[in-house]
């Protein structure tokens, strides 16, 4: 089974999915946010399409570790999603994942227009890959 990772923003949701061995994350799509109901509907369809067994959602924390306003919105989204799907949903600290994604794209000399199109997807990859790497490290210790 696969694991799906999300980078939830105010305007978009970046989506990444693991390989079947749950070792690597691949960016899949960016959902343009419409309404909570439609967003949940699109996410649910992706979960079914990719036969996902677990969801990982990036939770933005402030640099001091506290949760900010966007984190509250994400927790509300997770609560709504839990009503629709019967798989575990975990959060991971997503501090700086969007900045890491932007830096990666800048180093690759990707144009500003293209960066804007893929940054949320790449942030979702970073979120999911962080989770997958932790699982590998946990199993090796």
Curated annotation (Swiss-Prot):
Enzyme Commission code(s) on record: 3.1.-.-
Enzyme class: hydrolase
GO CC field: cytosol
Annotated SUPFAM superfamilies: Ribonuclease H-like
InterPro entries associated with the record: RNaseH-like_sf, YqgF, YqgF/RNaseH-like_dom, YqgF/RNaseH-like_dom_sf
GO biological process, one term: rRNA 5'-end processing
Functional description taken from the UniProt entry: Could be a nuclease involved in processing of the 5'-end of pre-16S rRNA.
Protein name as catalogued: Putative pre-16S rRNA nuclease
Organism from which the protein derives: Natranaerobius thermophilus (strain ATCC BAA-1301 / DSM 18059 / JW/NM-WN-LF)
